[in-house]
């Protein structure tokens, strides 16, 4: 979890129409991608004077029920070879963000998608909005109707209304298709 000092100041005096957003970034062994994303995304968010919190959600296995920080480091292992559960991580990211600050909108952001335009608004819409509709690897068009993976804005009340993402999908994909259907 992190919020920049300048953003904390912005959070105390939110301009009309601006809302607090939590960005949840599920990650697995893509730390170089994360550095590139943050170098590009944070200045964009700051230039839009948004109040934001970024939550990094990494899948780990706990080998201890003791959760003090020193023991947590010793008894936490990454989950190599374990199937990825992106839906579970995104749900956990929302819960952690709610423990840190109240927010109106959650943005689920894949770590390997970089905004290519400074005109791309990250302000919270009143309805779910798929932001990554033009990805270079898909020749700037969606491969199928209903794709909402990549970068997705969801007002918190609507996310809670559908009970978040399913935790039942292991491996890459399907959690966002299920979310779209609900």
Regions found by a protein language model. Give the residues of each.
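N-proximal low-complexity "stem/linker" segments adjacent to membrane-targeting elements
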Residues: 1-43, 47, 67
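Surface-exposed beta-strand-to-loop junctions
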Residues: 15-22, 51-57, 70-75, 155-163
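Short, flexible loop/turn elements at secondary-structure junctions
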Residues: 27-29, 61, 77, 135, ...
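Short acidic, S/G/P-rich loop/turn micro-motifs used as interaction or catalytic elements
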Residues: 30-32, 63, 113-115
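Active-site-proximal specificity loops/subdomain of glycosyltransferases
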Residues: 35, 49-103, 138
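Conserved short acidic donor-positioning loop in nucleotide-sugar-dependent glycosyltransferases
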Residues: 41, 59-60, 111
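Active-site machinery of serine-nucleophile hydrolases
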Residues: 46, 52, 132
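Conserved catalytic core of nucleotide-sugar-dependent glycosyltransferases
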Residues: 81, 85-90, 94-109, 113-182
């Amino acid at each position: 979890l992190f919020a920049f000092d300048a953003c904390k100041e912005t959070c105390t005096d939110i301009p009309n129409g601006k809302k607090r957003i939590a960005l949840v970034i599920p990650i697995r062994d893509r730390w170089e991608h994360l550095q590139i994303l943050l170098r590009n995304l944070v200045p964009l968010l700051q230039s839009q004077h948004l109040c934001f919190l970024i939550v990094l959600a990494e899948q780990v296995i706990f080998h201890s029920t003791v959760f003090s920080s020193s023991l947590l480091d010793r008894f936490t292992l990454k989950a190599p070879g374990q199937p990825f559960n992106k839906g579970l991580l995104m749900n956990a990211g929302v819960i952690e963000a709610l423990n840190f600050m109240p927010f109106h909108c959650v943005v689920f952001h894949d770590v390997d998608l970089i905004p290519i335009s400074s005109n791309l608004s990250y302000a919270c819409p009143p309805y779910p909005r798929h932001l990554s509709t033009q990805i270079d690897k898909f020749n700037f068009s969606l491969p199928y109707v209903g794709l909402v993976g990549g970068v997705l804005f969801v007002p918190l009340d609507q996310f809670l209304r559908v009970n978040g993402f399913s935790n039942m999908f292991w491996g890459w994909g399907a959690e966002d298709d299920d979310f779209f259907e609900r």
